[in-house]
Amino acid sequence: MSIKLFLLIFLAVILAIALMAGMMMLRSMFMATRGRKIAAYPDPRKALVVLDIQEGYTGTATRQPVTRPPTSGMLFIVNSLIEKATESGMEVAYIRQVFSNNLFVRLHGGRRQGRVIIDRRIKMINDNDFEKNRTDAFSSRQFEQFLIDKHVNELYLVGVDAAYCIYYTALGALNRGYKVAVIADAVMSRKKMADVLERYKRKGIEVVTSEELLSMV
């Protein structure tokens, strides 16, 4: 076997391995995680989870149309929910997407600080700020442990993208025994929202409006 042929075969094998690794990584990005079931807390609490409303997706630093910039009305609703949740004693947690893989960094606008911080228009009322590198927020062990430490058993999800990160986070929550609801007028997606919300319902994920949530807390 000539050296040239050997090198071609070697490069082909390396390329195949890299391709398989990339496909496996991509597949893992779009899967709900599994974890231990939460305990039956004697003093269960609720949490509002604000997902991926950050400068790289919704603010002035966005470059890729991962989601359409939200209207001021949608941000107003999210901020109103944050205020009400705080007043009622609910926990509020903020989740940010921070990709560690270079390919995903390039595709999603980079890892620069200006792109991964929470959208400046969103009210930050605490330091419950968690990073994830997959669609499911439960891929963050710190976030999962935070909910356990606070005895949370009920989650309300707002943010982007309703078709992916919020959806897989909701499934991750169900896998752990949480009661979970998505706030229909406080989420957004490039996909048709009616279809996205119907997908939630088929999976047993509750869909409520911000008005309904405000009346419950």
What residue ranges belong to the model's regions?
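N-terminal signal-anchor transmembrane helix
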Residues: 28-63
